[in-house]
Amino acid sequence: MTTKVDIVNSGATRAEYIEVEPNVKLHISDGGEGRPIVLIHGWLLSDEMYEYQYNDLIKNKFRVIGITLRGFGKSDKPYGNYNYDVHALDIKRVLDILEINDAVLVGFSMGGAIAVRYLSIYSGAHVSKLVLAGAAVPLWTNRKDFPYNLNQSSVDDLIILNYTDRPKLLNYFARIFSATPTSLNKGIGNWLKGIGLSASSYATAHCLVALRDTDLREDLVKIKMATLIMHGKKDKICSFDLALQTNAGIANSQLVAFEESGHSLFLEESEKFNDELIKFAGK
């Protein structure tokens, strides 16, 4: 007996590249019909990281818009600033051009930090709900009054490694990306490293500086909209302490722990990740 496999219909054909400033175009994956869900990827990655989310979300009657940040994936890679404000402005311009309203904004890792800065600067323009997944929020590095996650000097070492042996940098993150070295199969690991190598070295380093230095604690208190925080309990890149601090910092937030996941909760527990996102976005 055979089981019929349904192919997801992505709906209308839309622009794959959007110009956010002269000579800078961002790669956009835009499919489906319904309430918009806007996906922002993490450091080193691109909108391709959400491959195992797109079909489920489109099938559940959402319009899914994956934005690849400048410097990464198939987007343009200009020299210049790569702080959170620049990325937030790029997102604003994409959503302006697409005339998006009532969106669910999803940010993974560094993408979560950029999503928080976006909402803080632009007062929630185009967006009605926020999802933070394994987010580098409110800080990625520790301070005297924030004793969590990495030392700033550890990030300096990563910046040096980026300039001297970028494949080694990617191999290091591949080893700590999941809960255990075998949580993701070798093929998935190679796929992620391939995406990572498509990033520019310049953007990779400058985004590490933004991750190292940016404090979003004052941004969090400006977020009033409903917020879903999803975070792996075994995350070695953005420790679970960050999720607890973020949950405490956003008044209207709920935290869902992924007990079996490291940083790659969207892959290690993809079914749960998609179900939680669909449930939250559909309310």
State what each model feature region is.
Residues 1-38, 59-62, 100-101, 281-283:
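Alpha/beta-hydrolase fold catalytic core
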Residues 223, 229-231:
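Short beta-strand/loop motif that positions the catalytic acidic residue
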Residues 86-103:
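Conserved acidic catalytic loop of the alpha/beta-hydrolase fold
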Residues 141, 145-149, 160-221:
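Conserved alpha/beta-hydrolase catalytic His-Asp/Glu region
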Residues 234-238:
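Acidic catalytic loop of the alpha/beta-hydrolase fold
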Residues 253-283:
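Catalytic active-site module of serine/aspartate enzymes centered on a nucleophile-bearing elbow/loop
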Residues 24-80:
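Conserved HGGG/HGGXW glycine-rich cap/lid loop of the alpha/beta-hydrolase fold
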Residues 116-121, 125-164:
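Flexible "cap/lid" loop of the alpha/beta hydrolase fold
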